[in-house]
């Protein structure tokens, strides 16, 4: 019997033009069936972390999926194993939602099989955007493009799924829909890492949460243990109260800045 899917991240470093963006990021092993939320203030390196794992920026260190070195994968190997959703799709593309999803599935939108179309349409319908399948991406709203980007990220069935702020432009109903899809993917045996700004949403859906701050991992663990008044003051520089709902999940109430000078210095 094969061992469960595992992602290892050790001493991950990324620099842009000589400026360090991630400084020796290490995490406990991540396992199949887990949805990991990645949170932190603006500029903490969350998007860069996902891009490094996806092989979209140069990085050093150790990133291994089932013992295989992700940082050395070819483009085709990466496409096979990693589904990546960026913060936004290009706004000027004339591909339809269906064509873009087929391109993500097969590498191009031409010469696809009927079974490919069925698979792509099933994913599109599951995300609630079936009526948009034949519309060009440039005609869509920001929220609709996010859902189209999610379809492209998950259509291959990759074992590792990376979602960069997938709910930032969505209303409450579509936020639930996206997070429910992310949870479903994890429950099917994938590893799903989601960048979120909403800690309450992270606590509702994630098995564990990683907090990035000042280019490093500040804390990691289950949301109920990690999210605290002290964490919010140290990382986000706010006075806040963490309370727990009847299901034992934390939610956050922000009362104001902990220090106006500190808040301004982080922007």
Label the model's feature ranges.
Residues 61-69:
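Conserved ABC transporter NBD signature motif
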Residues 136-140, 144:
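Conserved ABC ATPase signature
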Residues 54:
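Helix-to-loop junction immediately C-terminal to a conserved catalytic motif
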Residues 1-31, 72-74, 91-92:
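A short, flexible loop at the N-terminus of ABC-type nucleotide-binding domains that lies
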Residues 161-165:
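Catalytic Walker B motif of ABC-type/P-loop ATPase nucleotide-binding domains
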Residues 39-41:
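The feature captures the beta-strand-to-loop junction immediately N-terminal to the Walker
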Residues 115-132:
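Conserved ABC ATPase "signature" region
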């Amino acid at each position: 019997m094969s061992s469960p899917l595992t992602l290892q991240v050790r001493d991950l470093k990324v620099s842009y033009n000589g400026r360090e963006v991630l400084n020796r990021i290490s995490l406990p092993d991540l396992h199949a069936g887990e949805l990991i939320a990645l949170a932190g203030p603006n500029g903490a390196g969350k998007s860069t972390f996902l891009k490094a794992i996806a092989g979209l920026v140069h990085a050093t260190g150790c990133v291994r999926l089932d013992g295989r070195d992700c940082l050395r994968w070819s483009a085709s190997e990466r496409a096979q194993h990693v589904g990546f959703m960026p913060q936004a799709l290009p706004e000027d593309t004339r591909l339809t939602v269906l064509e873009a999803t087929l391109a993500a599935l097969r590498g191009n939108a031409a010469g696809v099989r009927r079974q490919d179309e069925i698979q792509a349409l099933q994913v599109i319908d599951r995300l609630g955007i079936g009526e948009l399948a034949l519309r060009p991406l440039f005609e869509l709203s920001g929220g609709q493009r996010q859902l189209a980007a999610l379809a492209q990220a998950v259509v291959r069935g990759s074992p590792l799924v990376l979602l960069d702020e997938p709910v930032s432009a969505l209303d409450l109903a579509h936020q639930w829909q996206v997070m429910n899809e992310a949870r479903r993917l994890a429950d099917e045996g994938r590893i799903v890492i989601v960048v979120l700004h909403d800690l309450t949403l992270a606590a509702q859906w994630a098995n564990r949460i990683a907090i990035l701050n000042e280019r490093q991992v500040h804390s990691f663990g289950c949301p109920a243990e990690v999210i605290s008044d002290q964490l919010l003051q140290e990382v986000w520089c706010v006075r806040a109260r963490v309370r727990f709902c009847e299901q034992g999940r934390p939610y956050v109430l922000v009362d104001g800045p902990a220090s106006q000078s500190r808040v301004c210095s982080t922007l």
